[in-house]
C-alpha cells in the first residue's frame, strides 16, 4: 500500500480530503484502495479518498452543495475499479487463539431482519469502493440506522477480500457516520495479530475517536511502520500508563527537542503522560494559536476530560460532535448540543436522549432548572394536564429552529408523545406528534392517529396524513387514492413540490399505490420514476438477488445530500422498493415517513 502519512498531518477533523463529508482520516492517500494480498506492499491505481491535509489546513464544516450526479459518477467509477483480485489464503492460527476475522460483527442478522448472507455473491471489491465513497452524515436518520445495523451484522465477509481489511472498511465508514463506539465494537472483534496495515491505521483512528489513548497501546509494535512520527508519542503515553513514568517523560522530552511536531500535539501527549503514575508532570495546554482540530488533538484532549474550544468544534464536521456526545469523559450538561447533533444523525436513540436529559436534570441546580430543556422534558412526561405537557413538547420541538434541532426534538420526545391521546382538536400539533413517534420507531403508536387524521382535509393535516400513509404497518382506514394524493399536491408549497415527489415515490416503492396510479402521477408531476441509471440498475439487481446488505448500502449512498428534500424522487423510489423487497420494510417505511416529516 502507499506510504502512510502521519496522523499529525493527515488527521484533520475538519479537513478537505473527504470533501467536507467526513473527518480527515489518519490514513494515507489510497486508504481503502484495492490492495494486493496482504501484507505484500504494492502500488495501487485506484483514486485515494482525497488529497492529504497539510499542517494547519482546514475547511469549515459548511453544508455540502447538492450534486445529484455525484451518485452516478461514484457508481460508474466503482464499477471500473471493481476488478477481480486474488486473495492470499488466511494465515493459520492456533484454535485456542483464533477469532475468525471473516465472521466479525456484534449483531446476529436474524435479530435485525437480515438474511444470513446479506451481501450474497456481491463482489467485495465493489462493496469496498461503495463503502469508502459513502460519506456521512446522511440526509436520512433512519437510513443511517439501517446502514449501521448492516455494518455491525455478524456475517461472513464477501468473496474476494482480506477479512481484516473488510472490517477496516466497515469501521471506517462507521466513523464517518459518527458511530465511534460502533466502530470500536468491530475493531475489538478481531485479534491484533491478524491486523493488516490498513486495520492498524483504522484501529488508531477508532481509539482516538473514542477518547481512548490506551487503545493505541495494542498497536504499539505495528505503528512505526504505518505512522512513524506518531509512534514515539504513543510509546511515551503507553509507558506512562504502564507505570514507567521516567521513561515516558524522557520520550516526551526527546520528541520536544527534535522539534518536528507542533507544540500542541506534544503538549497533549505530555498531558496524557501526566495522567499516569509517578510522572509528577503538570501541563498547560495553549489553544489560542491552534486553528485546526485534528483527530489527535480531539482524542487526547477529550481523553483527559478537557473539552476542545467551541470555535474548533464549530469548524469540525458534525461527526465529531457525535463522537463527543458518546464520550464518557464529560457530564451530561456539557454534551447537550453535541447530543442534539448526534440524535438528528441517528447516533443517539430516543432512549439515550431521555437518559442524557435526565442526567442533566439531576446535575443542574434546582434554582436554575426552570426553562431548561431537561425541565421541559420532565414536564412533557409528568405535566399536570395535557396542555402543560403539550406546551413542554412544543418548546422541545422548536418549530422555528433549524432542521437539526427540530429532528433532535422529535427524537427526544418520542416516548413522551405516546402519552398524548389522538384528538381532532390537536390538528396543529398532530404532524409534530406523529413525526416524533416515527423518529422513535413507534409506528404502532402512530397508527392510533389514523382515524383522527382521516378527518383532516386541509393543509394543516396534509403532512400528518402523508407520514401515516407511508409509515404505519397497515394503513387500514386511511384514504390513499390518486385523488387524495392530488389534493396533497395542490396544497404542497414546498420548492418544486418536493414533498409531493417524495410522497409518490415512497407510496410506489412500498407498493401502496398500484403501478397504473403511480404511472399517471409520475407523468402528471414529471417525477421521472421510470428513468434508468447505473445506480437504479445496481440497486434493483441487489433487490432481485435478495442481497439485503448490498441494497441497504446502495440506498444509503443515495442519501448523500444536504437535506432529504434534495434526494431525488427517483432515488427514494428505488431505495424504498429495494429495502422492501429484501425484507427490510420496517426501515423502508421509516425512511419514507421521515422524508415527509423533514422535507
Where do the protein language model's features map onto the residues?
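Extended amphipathic alpha-helical segments with heptad-repeat/coiled-coil character used for oligomerization
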Residues: 215-308, 462-469, 480-482
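Residue-level signature for tetratricopeptide repeat
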Residues: 173, 202-207, 238-239, 435-436, ...
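N-terminal propeptides/low-complexity segments immediately following signal peptides
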Residues: 20-73
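Solenoid-like repeat scaffolds
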Residues: 96-98, 110-121, 135-136, 151-160, ...
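Solenoid-repeat scaffolds in large eukaryotic assemblies
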Residues: 180-183, 213-219, 245-251, 445-449, ...
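Generic helix N-cap/helix-start motif at coil->alpha-helix transitions
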Residues: 160-167, 192-201, 226-234, 261-267, ...
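Extended alpha-helical solenoid scaffold regions that build the rod-like backbones
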Residues: 296-472, 477
